[in-house]
């Protein structure tokens, strides 16, 4: 049995408690408050899906070239610029075809 001074014993005790506390924190609480067990994995997934449905979170990988389009009822939809250009193109084609077919109706 070695004789440690009171300062060395308190430093040893403090370091031991600190290491044990840090390991416990990293194991249990470091994942945004979710525990590392099976139920918490499903709870985290449920919260992520709810945030996507409520449009509080964006689908990963789908954030480039986005613009905001607001519909009449106040719902905001996020779309790519390519989708918007395709919609404008399709609307112009439909209007042109309707105009051409209107010649035959007269």
From Swiss-Prot:
Belongs to the MICOS complex subunit Mic12 family. Present with 2550 molecules/cell in log phase SD medium. Component of the MICOS complex, a large protein complex of the mitochondrial inner membrane that plays crucial roles in the maintenance of crista junctions, inner membrane architecture, and formation of contact sites to the outer membrane. Keywords: Membrane, Mitochondrion, Mitochondrion inner membrane, Transmembrane, Transmembrane helix. The lineage of its organism: Eukaryota, Fungi, Dikarya, Ascomycota, Saccharomycotina. It is found in: Mitochondrion inner membrane. It comes from Saccharomyces cerevisiae (strain ATCC 204508 / S288c). It is a single-pass membrane protein. InterPro entries: Mic12. It comes from the Eukaryota. The gene is MIC12. Residues 28-106 are mitochondrial intermembrane. The chain crosses the membrane at residues 11-27. Its main location: mitochondrion. This is MICOS complex subunit MIC12.
């Amino acid at each position: 049995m070695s004789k440690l001074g009171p300062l060395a014993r308190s430093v040893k005790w403090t370091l031991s408690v600190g290491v044990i506390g840090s390991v416990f924190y990293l194991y249990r609480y470091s994942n945004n408050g979710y525990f590392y067990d099976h139920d918490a994995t499903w709870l985290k997934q449920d919260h992520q899906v709810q945030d996507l449905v409520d449009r509080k979170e964006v689908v990963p990988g789908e954030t480039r070239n986005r613009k905001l389009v607001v519909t009449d009822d106040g719902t905001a939809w996020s779309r790519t610029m390519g989708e918007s250009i395709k919609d404008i193109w399709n609307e112009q084609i439909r209007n042109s075809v309707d105009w051409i077919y209107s010649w035959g109706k007269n």
